[in-house]
């Protein structure tokens, strides 16, 4: 028998073996009861795993599970549009000077809905009586201001974040309807189900599945229905750099440019960082509109319609 060479290096592991080893280590941590994964570790584990199924952000839980609760009497006494979710569910909306402000959160949602209503009115589209969906609703920051529409037809909110959906189900339903979706580009609705779908700052995070999700929106829209979404584009880059030069996203773009040289090339889109909440997707607006215009009619594109983002109104042909 030949002795092994003590100077030889072990064979390099494959990505699958590395993932399996990390998974076993995480399972052992849970089994030993020495602590759970923090949110960032859990996000990276879930979103970077190679699989064919969609994923979502689950409720925080320990070994015994988790519980859901009805809204408090204090919240029940408030008008529906003034019920504010816990700060972890607000995703920086209403955040200023190092803290969250309830009034800014509520006013911002109202202002964004007012913008959508104006865009639709300018396009000659009346959303009253239409079945409506907010894609990426979180705690209902915007759709809570559609009570009149909800009295006329169903208004749905869907999101990856199950805790936000559970909060909304307890505090905003009725009159609204909510469900948790996954990253897989499919929603459990029939073809031609909705007259209006809107999504604020969602296509800014989707990444490689953006076209698949756009086509899913087209599937569930009725012919003549409208899709209103917001995107980050070259105008967004310029506005962020001009107004907030110390914003972290400027550094993310510079880091990717240093690695790829993209800004000196004819780029059409790029993604900084990873995972749905962290990644940022930037489109060259005209190139993107030209491509998606083959699938849906482009009715309107307005820079700075949603903060620094460009609002885009699309219509399903037919």
Q: Positions of the model-derived regions?
A:
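A short, conserved alpha-helix within the catalytic core of class I
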Residues: 206-216
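Conserved alpha-helix/loop element of class I SAM-dependent methyltransferases that forms part
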Residues: 108-128
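N-terminal, positively charged/glycine-rich alpha-helical extensions of SAM-dependent methyltransferases
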Residues: 19-99
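Short alpha-helix
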Residues: 276-295
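Conserved class I S-adenosyl-L-methionine
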Residues: 128-138, 228-257
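A short acidic, Gly/Pro-enriched loop at the edge of an enzyme's catalytic core
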Residues: 185-197
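Class I SAM-dependent methyltransferase SAM/SAH-binding core
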Residues: 141-186
């Amino acid at each position: 028998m030949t002795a092994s060479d003590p100077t030889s290096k072990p064979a390099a592991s494959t990505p699958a073996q590395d993932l399996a080893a990390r998974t076993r280590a995480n399972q052992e941590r849970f089994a030993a009861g020495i602590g759970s994964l923090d949110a960032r570790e859990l996000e990276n584990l879930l979103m970077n795993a190679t699989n064919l199924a969609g994923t979502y952000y689950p409720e925080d839980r320990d070994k015994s599970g988790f519980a859901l609760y009805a809204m408090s009497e204090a919240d029940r006494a408030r008008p529906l549009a003034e019920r504010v979710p816990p700060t972890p569910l607000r995703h920086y909306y209403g955040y200023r000077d190092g803290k969250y402000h309830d009034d800014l959160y509520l006013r911002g949602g109202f202002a964004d809905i007012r913008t959508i209503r104006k865009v639709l009115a300018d396009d000659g589209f009346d959303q009253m009586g239409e079945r409506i969906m907010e894609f990426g609703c979180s705690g209902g920051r915007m759709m809570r201001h559609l009570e009149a529409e909800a009295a006329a037809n169903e208004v749905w909110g869907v999101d990856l974040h199950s805790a936000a959906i559970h909060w909304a189900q307890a505090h905003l339903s009725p009159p609204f309807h909510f469900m948790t979706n996954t990253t897989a580009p499919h929603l459990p609705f029939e073809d031609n189900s909705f007259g209006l779908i809107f999504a604020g700052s969602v296509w800014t995070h989707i990444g490689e599945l953006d076209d698949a999700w756009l086509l899913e929106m087209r599937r569930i829209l009725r012919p003549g229905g409208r899709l209103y979404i917001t995107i980050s584009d070259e105008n967004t880059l310029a506005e962020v750099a001009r107004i907030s030069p110390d914003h972290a996203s400027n550094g993310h773009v510079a880091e990717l440019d240093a690695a790829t040289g993209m800004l000196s090339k004819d780029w059409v889109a790029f993604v900084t960082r990873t995972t749905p909440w962290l990644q940022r997707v930037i489109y060259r607006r005209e190139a993107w509109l030209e491509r998606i215009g083959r699938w849906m009619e482009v009715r309107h594109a307005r820079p700075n319609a949603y903060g620094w983002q460009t609002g885009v109104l699309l219509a399903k042909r037919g």
